[in-house]
Amino acid sequence: LKILKSGVEMGLNISSLENMKLKELYEHAREYKVSYYSKLSKKELIFAILKARAEQEGYFFMEGVLEIIQSEGFGFLRPINYSPSSEDIYISASQIRRFDLRNGDKVSGKVRPPKENERYFGLLQVEAVNGDDPESAKERVHFPGLTPLYPDRHMNLETSTKHISTRIMDLLAPVGFGQRGLIVAPPKAGKTMLLKEIANSITTNHPDAELIVLLIDERPEEVTDIERSVAGDVVSSTFDEVPENHIKVAELVLERAMRLVEHKRDVVILMDSITRLARAYNLVIPPSGRTLSGGIDPAAFHRPKRFFGAARNIEEGGSLTILATALVDTGSRMDDVIYEEFKGTGNMELHLDRQLAERRIFPAIDIRRSGTRKEELLIPKDHLDKLWAIRKSMTDSPDFVEKFMRKLKQTKSNEEFFANLAEEMKAKRSH
């Protein structure tokens, strides 16, 4: 008991707790009166012990995403939606320098409440950075120093028979870890439904991947709908916010994703939409004096391209996948110019078709124009030959799409679909 008396004397920190066996952790959990400790995973148990210890000492245990105020050197941890709030935690410049903290790091630690003339909570001690020991944060390689490769690990999106859209994506526009994908969507073609299906497929099939859904300039009710139906992080800046806020939120989400990739994690950002982000930059950047048709400044493209271009598969481990929607046929020339500018930058495109949506054929995916570059790295060779046979037989008519979807719905999985296809091809050859 004497040994366990004080975590402070023992130097109870995240690295010492990680080296302990579960039996020892349970002893600490009992000492700090952690409830239901036997049901927690090791990582959750460590954080529960640190939290209980901080509370026993009269402090809070809090965490938030770091935003450094560049001109001042200090920063704030943003616990709510990556945006400034009354619950922000002040972190001093000396702590930032000591642990080599960067924008987007999720910092956890012991926090004291604000004194009478202060506005913010104050961080007293850094306990963890991105869930790891703070000392290990110093040894990370910076994101630009990591080696980008083509995606070579397939992200399986197929979940159940009824979710046809993700099955079509797996067949005709497969997504790999590290994909930079553009979902080209006219209005009312079902892009929100598609994003929700993709998000739920990722959380079901790849629970280890970190999912962030980023909604820029969207309707507030749509944000609520997605928050309730998606298990990942949903970060939003609705259309009633100023463009500066859209930019701030988007850039902090990108920094957060980069920090996770530096820790060799797989991160997926689903973004709606890159068009609205480019419009926000167009309003905020100082005018360069040149204007493209539609009234957009060419200088406004640099930073949204930096955002989209950050998606990559990393040789050293980890990946950043970005699937962003681009709006077309909205009646705005500017939106078309933005799409044209981003058209060649992705390595996967999924086109939604207004004609199909008007005929109530859902998912309204234009299967001819959708596809992935270097798909041979993601699809097995025997499946690839069959897919190319399907592509050769494709026509532009909506009837073909309807027939293709009917065939898909008749099979329980893509494997079964390929097996049926192989039999059909064999029968044709024998005739």
Language-model features, listed with the residues they occupy:
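Basic helix-extension-helix modules of the SAP/HeH family
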Residues: 1-57
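N-terminal "pre-motor" subdomain/linker immediately upstream of P-loop NTPase catalytic cores
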Residues: 38, 43-137
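Flexible glycine-/small-residue-rich
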Residues: 49-51, 68-70, 79-81, 93, ...
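Phosphate-interacting basic helix/loop segments used at nucleotide- and nucleic-acid interfaces
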Residues: 59-62, 164-168, 253-258, 307
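A generic structural signal for well-ordered coil/turn residues at beta-strand boundaries
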Residues: 62, 120-125, 142, 151, ...
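A structural connector/turn signal
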Residues: 94-96, 170, 245
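P-loop NTP-binding catalytic core
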Residues: 101, 114-183
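P-loop NTPase catalytic core
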Residues: 181, 189-192, 197-431
